[in-house]
UniProtKB/Swiss-Prot annotation:
The lineage of its organism: Bacteria, Pseudomonadati, Pseudomonadota, Alphaproteobacteria, Hyphomicrobiales. It comes from Xanthobacter autotrophicus (strain ATCC BAA-1158 / Py2). This is 2-(R)-hydroxypropyl-CoM dehydrogenase. The active site is at 155 (proton acceptor). The record marks 142 as: Transition state stabilizer. NAD(+) binds at residues 12-14, 33, 60-61, 87, 188-192. Changing residue 142 to C: Loss of activity. Keywords: NAD, Oxidoreductase, Plasmid. Homodimer in solution. Homotetramer. Component III of the aliphatic epoxide carboxylation complex together with components I, II and IV. The gene is xecD1. It catalyses: (R)-2-hydroxypropyl-coenzyme M + NAD(+) = 2-oxopropyl-coenzyme M + NADH + H(+). Changing residue 203 to A: Slight decrease in catalytic efficiency. Interactions between the sulfonate of coenzyme M (CoM) and specific arginine residues are key to the enantioselectivity and catalytic efficiency of R-HPCDH. The structure is stabilized by the interaction of the terminal carboxylates of each subunit with divalent metal ions.
Amino acid sequence: MSRVAIVTGASSGNGLAIATRFLARGDRVAALDLSAETLEETARTHWHAYADKVLRVRADVADEGDVNAAIAATMEQFGAIDVLVNNAGITGNSEAGVLHTTPVEQFDKVMAVNVRGIFLGCRAVLPHMLLQGAGVIVNIASVASLVAFPGRSAYTTSKGAVLQLTKSVAVDYAGSGIRCNAVCPGMIETPMTQWRLDQPELRDQVLARIPQKEIGTAAQVADAVMFLAGEDATYVNGAALVMDGAYTAI
């Protein structure tokens, strides 16, 4: 059955893989991204075969007005919202360091995108899902939701909050036919991580900490999302699907 999915941060990396996977199975997608130009380029290079099934919406996920307008546009275009994938996120300044050297502005920015953005997305779609009596929300968290990343206090804090928000939504709406789960990826090769993985020494350092000795792919993240959004996961609710090559198992 064809569904309507909203994917934030849809123009590259994990978001692109997720949105494309929905489209490939015949679903309609509202693709949200901060840059209208990047969305247009992505549509031209990756989604030309699905032109009638994609709604491109420029939106800042941390802006309530943008998010509400994007949800309204999706309802107007497609008439339903079956799945929300809160994928948009930022890591923050890699030089921010430990907590006492992290600028307040940097902390606020990371929390605004990574936590407020998911809160606003959930808040905007839930009334529609309640009316439908069904819906699925998948939040892209991180292994940093489970273990602290050294020198990344803002990012680690934000991803911990994402996991707790996921559980809160699951508990509050489980009786209404709505499921909410999180995907917790480890190191995934995307444009966001490419600067590190392109440096052989840093790549080796990353691989040394992963028992499986592999870097994950955006396609694998999309696999996890499709499982949680699908009929094989109807009793999975409030869960964290960890995909990290056993990184957090040691």
